[in-house]
Amino acid sequence: LQHLNNLIYEIEGNESLDDEKLESMQSLVASLTRIFTWLLSKKQLQLRGSDTKQQQIVSGWLQAKYSEYFDSIFKIWEYSNNKDFVAQFQIYGLSSVMNIVKAESKYMAPGEDQPFFATNTYDRVVRALIISGDKQNIRGSDYGIDNPLILEFYKQYFNAFWDVKYYFFRQLKMSLAQVLKDREDKFDMVLANLITLVKISEMYPRMDADSYTDTTLVQDVPQKVSDLSTFRSNFEKSWIILLQSKELSVDQYKAILFILHKRVIPFMNNPTKLMDFLTDSYNLGIEERDISLSIVALNGLWELIKRFNLDYPDFYTKLYCILTPELLHLNIRSRFLRMLDLFMTSTHLSATIVASFIK
């Protein structure tokens, strides 16, 4: 571990790393992963009441080294270095810690043959992942991030195994507020990483969710993992915590609004909780004279009215307020006109509003 840490410190600020040192680091991580997997299989990382004092001392020391192993990998995840060799080692570290999560889930269950997922260790992984990356790589157009680590996590784990996704939002819900409190400077990274994970595809196929949730990283997971209602609750709470934790910029509002109706709202238990966020988005668009922001906010409100029976009597009043000549110069003009046609042919439209528009 000391040798690995020395190499990690050497990376920081370096413009290059020769292949020999990179291979040395990867070999060290691979060796440590095998050692800790073996220790897990032999229950050497558990403190048991039947252990002698000497055994407890040894187990305590091993646990400290186990924790240090994760710290070493997570440290390099935070490096804001766009060099390929850094990304390569970050991704190698991801594979290693996820193998450990799998091993711990297998060997550290409270009882023999008892379904178990290593939530405490995975919580550390989630916390480290969501603050990873370089702020300079956040795209202004959609607030996604070019973060090789997050993209690899999405491809190999998040989108491939349901238990990984289920526990990601379970742990995020539980730890997000504390992460943002401890690392307030990382808010932009958290938002960009979450948008990147969520926007690529749906959380699960709504027409065939059962078969999707059967694919898991851990062989024997608790039965609750297949409960979509609990997943939606965790997903919903994670987003609400994030949206309420800090005042957002106009670009951040837009990025969230553009994915809201397809990637977020369908996977919440009670999407009407987004009403305040959508209203704030609309109002900010008016204040900043950015009608495009108000338009996409109205689109989100419309989804809640149409699909979840949200009672929002001010909708058409707010729509009427943005019907100005400026609309003709917007990049999303054609999209808005399609939305307007939908709004104006809806059964939600009252006779009074129809008369006002005709007038």
List each language-model region with its residue ranges.
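C-terminal structural cap/anchor segments
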Residues: 342-359
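Active-site-adjacent beta->alpha loops and helix N-cap segments on the catalytic face
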Residues: 329
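Alpha-helical solenoid scaffolds in large eukaryotic transport, assembly, and signaling factors
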Residues: 1-319, 323-324, 341-346
